[in-house]
Amino acid sequence: MSNVTPMMQQYLKIKSEYQDCLLFFRLGDFYEMFYEDAKEASRVLEITLTKRDAKKENPIPMCGVPYHSADSYIDTLVNNGYKVAICEQMEDPKQTKGMVRREVVRIVTPGTVMEQGGVDDKQNNYILSFVMNQPEIALSYCDVSTGELKVTHFNDEATLLNEITTINPNEVVINDNISDHLKRQINMVTETITVRETLSSEIYSVNQTEHKLMFQATQLLLDYIHHTQKRDLSHIEDVVQYAAIDYMKMDFYAKRNLELTESIRLKSKKGTLLWLMDETKTPMGARRLKQWIDRPLISKEQIEARLDIVDEFSAHFIERDTLRTYLNQVYDIERLVGRVSYGNVNARDLIQLKHSISEIPNIKALLNSMNQDTLVQVNQLEPLDDLLDILEQSLVEEPPISVKDGGLFKVGFNMQLDEYLEASKNGKTWLAELQAKERQRTGIKSLKISFNKVFGYFIEITRANLQNFEPSEFGYMRKQTLSNAERFITDELKEKEDIILGAEDKAIELEYQLFVQLREEVKKYTERLQQQAKIISELDCLQSFAEIAQKYNYTRPSFSENKTLELVESRHPVVERVMDYNDYVPNNCRLDNETFIYLITGPNMSGKSTYMRQVAIISIMAQMGAYVPCKEAVLPIFDQIFTRIGAADDLVSGKSTFMVEMLEAQKALTYATEDSLIIFDEIGRGTSTYDGLALAQAMIEYVAETSHAKTLFSTHYHELTTLDQALPSLKNVHVAANEYKGELIFLHKVKDGAVDDSYGIQVAKLADLPEKVISRAQVILSEFEASADKKSSISNLKMVENEPEINQENSNLSVEETTDTLSQKDFEQASFDLFENDQESEIELQIKNLNLSNMTPIEALVKLSELQNQLK
């Protein structure tokens, strides 16, 4: 370190304390980065990487950004998953002898962004923590920008992962005893995981819970927030305890497959349920809407209360339209309050706050004109006239962004400020008069009096006017020479400059002091403002429900006591919106305690998946308290929705399409109850025909015999359609299609009974496969159909590439019964050598004796390899 400058020694010492951050090190008007930080930042920010001490043997990599525009650079880094430590100069270099003292004043992390441009107005920016003491788990999360703070607890990792998926945090804080396996699963939701080894001894306000583990989770979270922000955050609310079981459960797969808040293909909001339902007018309302979509209610009383309000708004179009106008004038009160508390609020923010609270009396008067019994839940608004008066009397209507350059306060707000401003104003009037007088005295009409921060006030004369001009004759003293002009000062101008600039400096300094006082005064209203923001956000959501109900002809759902689901002329709300409303084909659905499984057949592209999804989405909308796209809708209240839709490998976890399919199915079969909804689309297509058919039938039987969950099960295994003979709870339906002159016409209508044709080749023709392929497929299909024995297995058919499907007449038989219908030769071909006799083979015994519960995946793979080698 002997050859390192004192400044770099200071840098290295501070950097050693923040090794997981990029250090923004303040040097004058720049934030500089060095060494690996500089290399990383220059790459991400696409700025020039240079060198410090370039002529030395080991120059230091360096890059920098201007401090006045640093926010955009910080946002870019944070959005790419980095943490940024802001190191400021704590002393004025002009007044300090030796090294300027520097400190990290804040760490910006993905979960603690407070700047207005750094967070999406319509998205919460959550940071989450959890602690485990098996089998108990406690989870706490916070949006630092709004102050929201919640905590819960449960007893299984499945609920933990569901909650993390629902909350969708940008950062997760954990202690150091969390397994690597669980970390990898969390990484699928968020890339930023912070490990905190110890907890602070400081006790934060978690007075609403006595649960020790929940206290620890909340303390871990708040400890980290205060460690990174390094200041008082009075806007963070008292922690609210909630229970995950109070809401409908949907795991990551269900939310993805149903495209509730993000589309699968484009990874965007457009084309999702959130996109459809968002007729909100405020950022707070938009965030609340997403929360409601993520957490549908299971309390009938709470659902009906929301629906009653939607009823009221639906019945009063003029009042609703007026309310939307008022809400459109309301800014993001939650985040404005957050910035007040944090200390980075500016005068324009406070003007936005003023305009927002000025609408509260209008909204309250409007609600008072409607049904008070219905609106009691949302008519708790409290006009903040005292705060409104403070803001109205203090700030000018259009203040500058900076709070340190003056121009913030109205004349008359502060007597001392008025005196300074008057002195400055009079001085500028005097300057204008002096300029006119000097022009007349010198005869130079282009003479002007100007100002800059380096030289102060000066008289400027262009070089063309200096040829016959003698400055000393007029008392001018040369101040600065330019290429095309000379600048002068006079004793009189210098004397007046001291008065003017003294007044301006004092005015600016006083204005900043007054603004800080105003900010602290506004901070006293934090709790009241947050309560108003919560009510306004709920109002905004409910008027949005009424707006889409009227716009798209939705109806109020009702809820059955006997767990019946009956949808009359139901539609998929998103698909309907993106296509012509009049072209959409509505469909019915009825599931009850006797018939709770629909087995759905029909050709590809006919609308099977859309039909199943719309039942799930309608159920979610109903339990949010919204109207639904149906002519009539009677629903049970579902506790959970499970889906198995589409085909996608999980490359991150190394899982194949079929493994993902089985994992999704496993969750449904394990956790579904009679109050659940299951959507299974084409189960078994990721494996061979026999395996897929066997698994599909076994799953249907399991649901029928065990959970009795309402189930929509689409399939191309036509052999399954005979299951209705053995399972009274199963009903066959199909999505109709007609073939006309060799062309396939999709009717998109769900009808009773099974379909008798998959129309696979016709669909391939629609996809414009080469004609040669289509023709060859038709020939092969004809050969299959001609050689198929109606009373035996299709294993006698000549197969091309893939195995054909089992004949429909044998589809109601078990795998064992099916093999009985084969010839001996066919049976030998279809059977495994392991099971050719009744004696247990050595390999079977080895498999039977494996202790799977104590084997790691790697050990299991090694053992499987050994068994495979024995068979070779």
Swiss-Prot record:
GO terms for molecular function: ATP binding; ATP-dependent DNA damage sensor activity; damaged DNA binding; mismatched DNA binding. SUPFAM superfamilies: DNA repair protein MutS, domain I (SSF55271), DNA repair protein MutS, domain II (SSF53150), DNA repair protein MutS, domain III (SSF48334), P-loop containing nucleoside triphosphate hydrolases (SSF52540). GO terms for biological process: mismatch repair. ATP binds at residues 602-609. One of its GO terms (cellular component) is cytosol. Gene3D superfamilies: 1.10.1420.10, DNA repair protein MutS, domain I, MutS, connector domain, P-loop containing nucleotide triphosphate hydrolases. Keywords: ATP-binding, DNA damage, DNA repair, DNA-binding, Nucleotide-binding. NCBIfam families: mutS1 (TIGR01070), PRK05399.1 (NF003810). HAMAP family: MutS (MF_00096). This is DNA mismatch repair protein MutS.
